[in-house]
Every structure is written in structure tokens, then in C-alpha cells.
Amino acid sequence: MLDRLQAVENRYEKLNELLSDPAIISDSNKLREYSKEQSDIQETVEVYREYKDVREQLKDAKAMLEDKLDAEMREMVKEEVSELESQEKTLSERLKILLVPKDPNDDKNVIVEVRGAAGGDEAALFAGDLYRMYSRYAEVQGWKTEIIEASYTELGGYKEIIFMINGKGAFAKLKFENGAHRVQRVPETESGGRIHTSTATVAVLPEAEEVEIDIHEKDVRVDTFASSGPGGQSVNTTMSAVRLTHLPTGVVVSCQDEKSQIKNKEKAMKVLRARVYDKFRQEAQAEYDQNRKQAVGTGDRSERIRTYNFPQNRVTDHRIGLTIQKLDQILQGKLDDFINALVMEDQAQRMEAAE
């Protein structure tokens, strides 16, 4: 491990030199590439330097115990050794995690797609609950949420809602939300008080930049149509809504949230790029994972990942067996307990795979 850490520190120092080179400074692509690489390894280098400093202090403290010391001084040095050993262990564990290969998409913005699935109107209402949950979580994180496309129901739910969350680390936190979310509750329209079970699916896609996925104009068919509101009625007499079809993959995206056709096309292209990128990413990940089973699902949209039980005010994540009796707070966006546990489980899996 120490050899790998030293190599990372050497690379960090080399990047410092490169970023001071006038030739690099004048090349915006290289400057961006090297700056990102340096930023990605900065925390590892800082923790490694702290680790080396603690080890040096520990070595000196243990050497002092070899000297002739009075009882009081010896006790003080022993306490210092104990404290330094604890620090060394903590830093060593942090370094093991930092050395685990990082998902290159973790720092990206995300496009989230929530759809009502089994359960009709109740599923659509639950899709709305999930959208508000993620919006509130994003707000707490200081991220910005923007609706790209929404298909409403007459009761105020969503057949489908697609929205973007802009914020560093959004994908790292939200990628584990991929899958089928199940809700158990008594619908307001249920006079007999029977509990109904409905589901909504969530897809979390990392935003893809143009440099990462090259979509040629000739490969995209553009169709325009009049926007429609709840119930299918026309709300716009101009052809402002846009449907994009990526011919090589068959991926289709529609957007009618904006009054301007140009803005709808821009939003639709963001989603199209993300979906095509995600399709290739999923295929590559499936090939990588075929020889090992992952404990935390991040891609299978059909996987039932979580149950929200209203009568018992509890939420259970089935992947890690975690149940929390705070459903009301979770729907207000307080997702940290689940997200932190899922991140830790993923890190453990990655560490195991790297060994």
C-alpha cells in the first residue's frame, strides 16, 4: 500500500510542475485534464502526508520509551504512543478507502427519471412523493433541481417526471436510488381502509458531456408536436414540443416543459446524451461484473430496492437490510442514513474486489 501511496504523491508533485508550465496553461484542454486529475488525488495525498507525519511521531515516541524516564514522564509517553497508534490506524483505514478505484462519474450532475409503475393512480402519486423527496434532499445539499419533462395525472401525480440535479457529487450520492421503490399505504379513495401496494421506478443517469459521448446530428431524428397538459389537452398551439430519436440505439426522448422549441430541444438533447452514455456504461459495467456479485445494486431498474410502509412509518432498504422508523422524515428528504450506509457497503465491496 505504501508504494502505491508514494506513487500517487509523486504524481501529485509532477502535476504541480505541469500546471505551472506556460505551455500547459495556454492549452485549455490539458489544463482542465491535469487540474481534474490533481483534484481527484489531492485528498489521498493530504491524508498520506498526515499518515507519514503520525508514523514519524510514533517512531520518536517509542524511541523515548527506550530511554531512562521517571514514572510520570513514562506514563505521559505511553499515553502519547497509544493516541498516535489510534491515529495511525484511523488514517490507514481512510487511505485504504481512498485507494479504491473511484467511479469516474461520481462528481457529475444527474438526470433522474421517476415513473409510476404498478398501481395506477396510487403509483403516480407515489412517483410525486419520490420527486419531492429527492428535490428536498438536493436542496439540503445545496444542489439545484430543474424539471426537464413531466407527464401529470388528474389526481396530481406523475406518470413520469424527468429532472436534473446540478451539484458536485450528485451521482455519487444518488446512484444507489436506481431500482423499483414499493409503497404500502391506504389510498385516500379507499373507503374500506385496505392497504394497497404500488411501485414506482427510479433511474439515475450521470450527465454526459459532449466530449464523452459524440452524438452526430445525422443520427438523431427530430419530431415536433404541440405540447399537452394533464388529461392530454393541448396547452400550446405552436409546435414547441420536441421528440428526439437516436437511430443507432433506438433511444427516444421527449420534452415539452418549455414554451420554446429551442429550449425543449436543448433539454431533450441533455437527456438523450445521458441515456445513450448510460446505455454504453451499463453494458461495460455488466461485462465487468459478470464474474462477481455486487451487494449494492446501482443499475438494475427492475430490482426492488426499498419499501415505504406508511401504516408502520418505516422504510426498509432490502439490499442492506436496513429499516428506519422515520418514513415521514425520509420523504422530507432526510436520506443520509440510507445513502451513507449504501456508500459504505459499496466501498467495502470495492475494497474486497481490489484485494
Curated annotation (Swiss-Prot):
GO MF terms held by the record: translation release factor activity, codon specific
Residues recorded as bearing N5-methylglutamine in the entry: Q233
UniProt keyword annotation of Phosphoprotein present: no
Location(s) in or outside the cell: Cytoplasm
Highest taxon, organism lineage: Bacteria
SUPFAM superfamilies: Release factor
Entries under Gene3D superfamilies matching the protein: 3.30.160.20, 3.30.70.1660, 6.10.140.1950
One term under GO cellular component: cytoplasm
PTM field: Methylated by PrmC. Methylation increases the termination efficiency of RF1.
Family recorded in the similarity comment: Belongs to the prokaryotic/mitochondrial release factor family.
Function: Peptide chain release factor 1 directs the termination of translation in response to the peptide chain termination codons UAG and UAA.
Name of the molecule in the record: Peptide chain release factor 1
